[in-house]
Structures are given as C-alpha cells and as structure tokens.
Amino acid sequence: MADTISYQYAALSALQRAADQDELFLAKYSEIEKKDAPCFFWGKLTQPYMTARCLIALSNVVQSSFNLTPAQLSMLKDPIVTAGNERLRFEGFSNCAGVYARVDVLPDGHDGEFLENGTTNVDFNAGMISALGSISKQEKVVMSVGPKEVGLYNKGEKVIERKVPLPVKWIKGLTTVQIYQSVAERMYSFNRIQTLQLFQTLPKGTVKCDYYLVMRGQKPAFSPVKSMNAICIGGLHRLRLLEPLLPFADELKVFAHPTMQSTIWQLYFGPVRFSLSLSRECWRGFSGEGAALESLLEDVPERWIEAMDKYSYANQQFNPTLFAIEEHIDLDKVDSLSARLAAMGLLGFDLDENSFFYRRLPFKTERILSLNPRMIAAEKLLEEDKVEIIANDGNRTEARVTGSGGVRHTVIL
C-alpha cells in the first residue's frame, strides 16, 4: 500500500483577474516550519562538575571588561544558550566585546532529549552562580533549556533564570567572531603539563605590548620577542580568564586567524569544551564593523537567504565547501549567504567540526543593514552618484568620492 502524505496549507490558492490578465496565487507549504515548543532540552548532565566550572568561567568572561566600574560589571552575566544537533552551547562576550567565550556540551556530555531546536538569552544571577559553584563531581544534575528560561535542578532544589533581551553589540560581535573563526587555523596542541607550563610564563599585571606564543624545545612559553611561527597576542592578560580551568583540562588547542586578527584558545574536558577568543587588541572589540563587509557586497536575492536559513535550521550545521559542492552553488555565493545569516546572528562556527552551527534568532534581513551602517553610507553615496571610478585594472582601483561640504576624496584600493 502506498504511503500517504498530508499537506496542510495556511491559506487557499486563488485565481484573480486584474488589469485584463489572470493572476494565479498558489498557497505556500514548507515541510521545514519552525515550531514553538515550551522546552528545547531536558536531561541530565553526565559531567556536571566540569560543565558547572565552565559555565562559571563563561560568566566571568561576560562580567569582565576593561572600561567599566565594578558596580557596572556586577550586572553583566547574560549567556546565549542554544540547544540543537545533540549539543548545548553557551556563549557570551565581555562587555568591551573583545573577548568571546563558548561552552560546548557535546552528545556524551548529557543524557537528555532535544524536543526542539532553539536559542534563548538568559541572565545568570547570583543564585545560578551559587548553584553552579556548589555542584560536586558525583551529583546528579538536571538542566532544562526553553524559549523563555534555563533551569538547573539539583538535590530537590531548582534555580530558574528568565530570558532577557539580547544586546545589539553581541549580535555584531557574533558576526565578526564566526568570520574570523571560519578561517582560523590550528597552530598548536598541548597536553595538561605543557598547558600549565605555558601559563606559568604569563606575566603579572596588565600587558600593554604584544606578546608571542613561542616554542622553546618542547616547552611553550609567552615571550615579548617574536620568533619564527610565533602567534601574536594582544592584551595577553585577558588569558587569565582561563586559569581556574587549567588544572582540569585534558588538552589545549590554539588557533589563529591568518593575519592574527584573533586567537582562539580551546580547552577540552572530555565531552565538554571551553573556548576563549581574543580580539587583536584590548581596545578593539569583535563588535566593530568591517569583517563582514566584503562578503556582504555581492547582491543576493532575499529568497536565497530565506532558503539558506531553512536549510540551516533543518540541518543545524553545515560545511560551506561541501554545501557548495552538493548544491552546485558557487563558493563565493555560499560565503555571501553565510555572511548574511551571520550578520543576523544566526550562525556560529565550530572549529573542531569545521562547520557552522545554527542559532534560532528572529529572521530579520533589515538587521543586516542596521548593524552595518558603513554599508548604508556606501549605498547612499552610490545612489547619489557621488562615486566616480577613475581607474580599475583588476589589481588597483582609484575613485573620486564626493563627501560632505562638496569635498572630493581620492580613494585607492
């Protein structure tokens, strides 16, 4: 007997006559509809002690900054929580947006059920931090993640944290971070002993000059002197945020952007990962504009962006190169599509899996321009015919741009 598939349409199709011609409007149906569920995940944590320690470290990152008073800092402990693809991901930025941290609870790190894929943003108050700090290695801890709250259940007690607004600065930061991470390369892997040796060379106090991660024989070290294959690190003292976790780490992997725009420090605790990304300088946050602009220049139909959003939601992750091959799409087009989803905060990047993962946030294409005002300004100049190309030979472009007050600028790229 043949299988029967039932389709339910939200509206009727219609044939209408207008301006002496017939217009057919077909009702749309999609098998990939985003559902609203009261709970995304419910289950036990198999490594509750290390998961708790990583979440506390994440909260410390969110609380950290280099330009706020202690009173202002105490108000900041808001992680983004994503449940999907058998993984729990907790993310956050320092207030200066120059440090990004993420906790990944992998499939073996929990024993639970994913009822729906989703993302929420909650405030980890003192009650949650205290509950996390009291968890021991042998305890049975249950966690729930829903669209409006995150819950922690232990010893017959529960702590519930409610959803709070997601800062716009964070959405801008998420865009830059995933772009930098998607091109980062693994430079070093260290075992626990090497990791502890490395951090023993971390200088005290605030470091104002660049330092380098170098190898001295089999021992890694931080040095103010550059050497071959060294990794450049600005604001080295920010790595102290990792120190509480170092005694428990099985391994440390260090990744770097090809032009050292960021470094990523990833600690492993069995089925739990903690990663810390540093911007090039203390004063330079990931929320600054620029990283996504080149990928956003190419015009892409909005229907393609919507299709990519549905594909990402359905699969929860994808490798851009494989996606381009499988779907017969030019890789540059995939980069442009990925950049647009990232500009809405919808994509993150997993370095170990070399793939994007999906955050379920509101799909608002207008957010792309609102978070990238340089694009708006550039498009306005073009619309007002204030850009004149003088020369363009493929390697060099010279243009005259009319600015405010009629001042003409020469721009050479």
Q: What positions do the PLM features span?
A:
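Long, low-complexity, compositionally biased intrinsically disordered regions
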Residues: 1-413
